[in-house]
């Protein structure tokens, strides 16, 4: 996400990836349906972080679960709230989200260097 924010300001960005492909862990996380976030209130959401909640509050409030959903929508990846309150992409897959994100990054001029 940092690469996207910086590149959107016109700053050249190069992402160095240790693996041979982009988003390997992201794709693995998506194998179970890609639970992106939760739809509960901010206070309840923060309570999940235990003792670290107050330290993390400014960062999470700066990019909230609703902001994450809007970001996905901006990539053309609609989300929905499941019966558990968890938020998922409508596709239930990580790969469409990753492809859309990579396309956005490349359109912003972000370069990728992968481990050979």
Language-model-detected regions and their locations in the chain:
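Feature captures the FAD/FMN-dependent oxidoreductase FAD-binding
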Residues: 61-116
């Amino acid at each position: 996400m940092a690469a996207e924010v910086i590149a959107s300001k016109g700053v050249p960005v190069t992402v160095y990836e240790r693996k041979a492909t982009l988003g390997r862990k992201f794709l693995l996380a998506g194998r179970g349906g890609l639970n992106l976030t939760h739809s509960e209130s901010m206070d309840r959401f923060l309570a999940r972080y235990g003792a670290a909640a107050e330290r993390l509050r400014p960062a999470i409030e700066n990019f909230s679960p609703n902001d994450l959903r809007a970001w996905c929508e901006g990539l053309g990846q609609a989300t929905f709230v499941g019966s558990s309150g968890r938020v998922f992409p409508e596709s239930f897959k990580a790969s469409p989200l990753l492809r859309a994100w990579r396309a956005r990054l490349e359109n912003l001029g972000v370069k990728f260097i992968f481990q050979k």
